[in-house]
């Protein structure tokens, strides 16, 4: 689960990570009524969307007066912000965050993520933070260092002193912030915390000028206070609907809808669709216990995308028996009167019985025995 920058800074504040003071506004009028709480002559106005790259896209503005801040807020509210992370359709700005300006001496990058190879959190630090961090990673990887974390000691500052020209005082201040975000990471079951930039001010203080936190969806039941931060307006409505039925769904830009059991098989299915020259419209994992109802809902979600021109169902029967899933497919197809081509590949437990159910259904369902064959058939039907 993602949250907005202003919400992430509220979390930081609880863990004593220094952040600039600010407030949320949904209109220019709110700026005038709230700006008195900020002790600054310069203000930063930031569009609040669940995507990075806002600065380069015009979603972060520096205002040198209250009137200018109001105008920026007025311009941003309701606009569609397109960044390299939003996709071409962009995201609508419904809120902005107005905060005190900071005197910036130097920008750094600091994040905490889960390393899938090590199966534990790691810190990532760079002396070149800011809007161009992606370019730094691409062109100057030596300026980025990863820290393996010993859970017993959290942050080890020795690599900072050996890789970067930092004073003992700078290392101490960065280490203190790193330890605090590690505490926040563990306490909230976060999957990622990012500060970009972490700035050193002219007075020598370090402040989290931006904040990003993602949380582990599987741990949210332990954190009702974090669930309250969820902004459904920022999420894809199909993904919200899918979560109600235990379906893992991610909308994409292609024309072939996918219904698969198992995340690995789902990714392999999308890969082979691309291999044969088409694009998947979604990732959809129905899990290991799908029923007629969940299959029906899965079809509804897939077909709610007007770009879908065909559907590939790829099921490997293990816990999920192929005859049960076949019955669910037939029932759902009859109920919904599916008009687009439907290719079904069944393999595993009771797959022969499943194929027989499909054949005797009287529906125009195209059967396939192998994934390669299934992908070629659906690509041919769509093209």
Swiss-Prot record:
Residues binding ATP are 46, 53-55, 99, 102, 107
Concerning InterPro entries, the annotation shows:
ATP-grasp (IPR011761), ATP-grasp_succ-CoA_synth-type (IPR013650), ATP_grasp_subdomain_1 (IPR013815), Succ-CoA_synthase_bsu_CS (IPR017866), SUCC_ACL_C (IPR005811), Succ_CoA_ligase-like_bsu (IPR005809), Succinyl-CoA_synth-like (IPR016102)
UniProt-annotated binding residues for substrate? 261, 318-320
Q: Which PANTHER family does the protein's record reference?
A: SUCCINATE--COA LIGASE [GDP-FORMING] SUBUNIT BETA, MITOCHONDRIAL (PTHR11815:SF10), SUCCINYL-COA SYNTHETASE BETA CHAIN (PTHR11815)
Job description of the protein: Succinyl-CoA synthetase functions in the citric acid cycle (TCA), coupling the hydrolysis of succinyl-CoA to the synthesis of either ATP or GTP and thus represents the only step of substrate-level phosphorylation in the TCA. The beta subunit provides nucleotide specificity of the enzyme and binds the substrate succinate, while the binding sites for coenzyme A and phosphate are found in the alpha subunit.
Q: What name has this protein been given in UniProt?
A: Succinate--CoA ligase [ADP-forming] subunit beta
Subunit info?
Answer: Heterotetramer of two alpha and two beta subunits.
Q: Which HAMAP family match?
A: Succ_CoA_beta
Q: Where does Mg(2+) bind?
A: 196, 210
How many and how are cofactors bound here?
Answer: Binds 1 Mg(2+) ion per subunit.
Q: Is Cytoplasm one of the keywords UniProt gives this record? A: no
A GO cellular component term found in this entry reads: cytosol
Protein's UniProt keywords contain Ligase: yes
- Annotated ATP-grasp domain ranges read 9-241
Functional pathway? Carbohydrate metabolism; tricarboxylic acid cycle; succinate from succinyl-CoA (ligase route): step 1/1
Cofactor(s) needed: Mg(2+)
> What family is this?
Belongs to the succinate/malate CoA ligase beta subunit family.
For biological process, the GO terms are:
succinyl-CoA metabolic process; tricarboxylic acid cycle
One GO MF term, please?
A: ATP binding
Which reactions fall under this protein's catalytic activity? succinate + ATP + CoA = succinyl-CoA + ADP + phosphate; GTP + succinate + CoA = succinyl-CoA + GDP + phosphate
Q: Into which EC class is this enzyme placed?
A: ligase
Task: Specify the species.
Answer: Wolbachia pipientis wMel
Enzyme Commission number(s) = 6.2.1.5
Key words, A-Z: ATP-binding, Ligase, Magnesium, Metal-binding, Nucleotide-binding, Tricarboxylic acid cycle
């Amino acid at each position: 689960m993602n949250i907005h920058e202003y919400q992430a800074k509220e979390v930081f504040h609880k863990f004593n990570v220094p952040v600039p003071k600010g407030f949320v506004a949904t209109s220019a009028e709110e700026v005038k009524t709230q700006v008195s709480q900020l002790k600054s002559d310069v203000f930063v106005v930031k569009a609040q969307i669940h995507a990075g790259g806002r600065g380069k896209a015009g979603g972060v503005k520096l205002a040198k007066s209250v009137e200018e801040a109001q105008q920026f807020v007025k311009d941003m509210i309701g606009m569609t912000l397109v960044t390299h992370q939003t996709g071409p359709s962009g995201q609508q700005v419904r809120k902005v965050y107005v905060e005190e300006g900071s005197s910036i001496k130097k920008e750094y990058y600091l994040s905490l993520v889960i390393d899938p190879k090590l199966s534990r959190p790691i810190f990532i630090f760079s002396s070149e933070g800011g809007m161009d961090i992606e370019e730094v990673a691409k062109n100057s990887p030596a300026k980025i260092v990863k820290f393996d974390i010993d859970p017993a000691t959290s942050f080890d500052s020795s690599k900072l002193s050996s890789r970067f020209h930092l004073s003992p005082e700078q290392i101490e201040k960065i280490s203190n912030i790193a330890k605090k975000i590690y505490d926040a990471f563990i306490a909230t079951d976060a999957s990622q915390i990012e500060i970009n930039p972490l700035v050193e001010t002219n007075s020598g203080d370090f402040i989290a000028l931006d904040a990003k936190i993602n949380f582990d969806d599987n741990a949210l039941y332990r954190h009702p206070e974090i669930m309250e931060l969820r902004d459904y307006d920022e999420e894809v409505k199909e993904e919200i609907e899918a979560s109600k039925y235990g379906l893992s769904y991610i909308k994409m830009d292609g024309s072939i809808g996918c219904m698969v059991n198992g995340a690995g098989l789902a990714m392999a299915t999308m890969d082979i669709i691309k291999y044969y020259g088409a694009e998947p419209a979604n990732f959809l994992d129905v899990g290991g216990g799908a029923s007629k109802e969940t299959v029906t809902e899965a079809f509804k979600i897939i077909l709610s995308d007007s770009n879908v021109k065909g559907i590939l169902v790829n099921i490997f029967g293990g816990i999920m028996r192929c005859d049960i899933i076949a019955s669910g497919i037939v029932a759902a197809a009859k109920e919904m009167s599916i008009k687009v081509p439907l290719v079904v590949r069944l393999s595993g437990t009771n797959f022969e019985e499943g194929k027989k159910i499909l054949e005797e259904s009287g529906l125009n369902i195209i059967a396939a025995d192998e994934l390669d064959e299934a992908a070629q058939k659906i690509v041919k039907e769509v093209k």
